[in-house]
């Protein structure tokens, strides 16, 4: 609005990765898992789920149910669910066998209902033939991307003329949601040019 631009017509690709996948896959809001769907799933499986939803801003998954949280975190980290559980079992208060059964039941529930979650969209995008090409690709807040998101970025990156990736590992705030800041830091080994800004224009001084 400040620059007199129309978001849909002038900036059709100015989106979060989840929004871009949603758009490219031709999804509708009616086909997406909602909080009430998770509650219905919980009632069906006999587990309490008071909160379960994806942020519309950054696509992070939030739930008061530890089983759902671990299932989604393993997916965005691109890890085998039970191996991820085994690496954290000393700090988790959930059962291994129940975790596996719930993960499988959640897949069946979504299939029966014809619903997807935002993590499904990223996985489906990776299977889809990439049609768009970009002269310039700009990825912001890269320190907060999960490995699944990085896989999506690399697919888009491969069809971009020039790519800029911006981030600050000191501001990584989504490790709890599966963000892989180490992947961001390791980019210095494969990019042509790295520029470090000595002045923060968000926090002057």
Question: Could you tell me what each predicted segment is?
Answer:
Residues 51-138, 147-152, 165, 175:
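Accessory N-terminal region flanking or inserted into the helicase ATPase core
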Residues 15, 27, 33-36, 94-97, ...:
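Short coil/turn linker and secondary-structure boundary residues
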Residues 1-12, 16, 116, 120, ...:
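Short intrinsically disordered, low-complexity coil segments enriched in acidic
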Residues 20, 27, 74-77, 190:
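Phosphate/oxyanion-binding loops and surfaces in catalytic or ligand/nucleic-acid-binding neighborhoods
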Residues 2-66:
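Conserved P-loop NTPase-based nucleic-acid remodeling module centered on helicase motor cores
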Residues 10, 22, 111, 174, ...:
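Short, flexible active-site loop motifs that bind/organize anionic cofactors or intermediates
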Residues 2-7, 42-45, 121, 125-129, ...:
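Alpha-helix C-terminal capping segments
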Residues 15, 143-205:
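Conserved helicase motor core of SF1/SF2 NTP-dependent helicases
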């Amino acid at each position: 609005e400040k620059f007199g631009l129309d978001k849909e017509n002038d900036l059709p690709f100015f989106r979060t990765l989840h929004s871009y996948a949603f758009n490219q896959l031709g999804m509708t809001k009616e086909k997406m898992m909602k909080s009430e769907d998770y509650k219905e799933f919980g009632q069906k499986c006999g587990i309490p789920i008071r909160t379960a939803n994806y942020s519309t801003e950054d696509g992070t998954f939030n739930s008061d149910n530890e089983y759902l949280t671990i299932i989604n975190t393993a997916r965005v980290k691109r890890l085998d669910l039970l191996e991820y559980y085994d690496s954290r079992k000393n700090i988790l208060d959930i059962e291994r066998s129940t975790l596996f059964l719930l993960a499988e039941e959640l897949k069946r529930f979504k299939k029966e209902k014809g619903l997807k979650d935002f993590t499904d969209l990223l996985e489906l995008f990776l299977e889809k033939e990439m049609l768009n090409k970009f002269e310039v690709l700009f990825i912001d807040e890269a320190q907060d991307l999960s490995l699944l998101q990085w896989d999506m970025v690399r697919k888009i990156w491969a069809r971009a003329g020039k790519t800029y990736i911006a981030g600050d590992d000191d501001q990584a705030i989504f490790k709890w949601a599966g963000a892989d800041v180490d992947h961001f830091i390791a980019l210095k080994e494969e990019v042509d040019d790295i520029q470090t800004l000595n002045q923060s224009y968000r926090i002057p001084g």
